[in-house]
């Protein structure tokens, strides 16, 4: 498919999970920009992030797969699907977990199916002095 999920803090909770997820998201977008410059392509990507508890486990009887379920997974998916190309859209819950001074811009409140209004932000960068 054209959608990939990355997680941090499994199988054990990691209270410092948001910073590496934010840094990875920024790095992926930067690498995509460099790829486009070097190859004359115009590939675009949306990234969404949310923080919270998930249910995780292995399913299957002949072909096993490790999978995740729950409201947190659904919200992260909504952040990606309602995002803007070449932007990282995050929830307030994710923003509140950041310990480094990442720059964020308030996008506004989005109506999220099955949840209601959710405050969202665009993750812009991490100032050099804080990296």
Label the predicted regions:
Residues 2-3, 24, 97:
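Short acidic/histidine-centered micro-motifs embedded in hydrophobic/aromatic stretches
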Residues 5, 9, 16, 57-59, ...:
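Active-site-proximal flexible loops/turns
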């Amino acid at each position: 498919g054209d959608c990939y999920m990355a997680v941090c803090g499994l199988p054990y909770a990691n209270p410092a999970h948001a910073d590496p997820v934010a840094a990875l998201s920024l790095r992926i977008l930067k690498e995509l920009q460099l790829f486009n410059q070097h190859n004359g392509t115009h590939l675009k990507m949306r990234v969404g992030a949310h923080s919270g508890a998930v249910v995780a486990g292995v399913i299957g009887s002949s072909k096993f797969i490790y999978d995740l379920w729950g409201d947190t997974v659904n919200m992260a998916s909504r952040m990606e699907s309602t995002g803007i190309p070449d932007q990282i859209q995050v929830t307030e819950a994710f923003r509140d977990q950041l310990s480094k001074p990442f720059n964020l811009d308030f996008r506004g409140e989005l109506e999220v199916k099955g949840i209601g209004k959710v405050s969202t932000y665009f993750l812009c960068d991490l100032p050099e002095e804080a990296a």
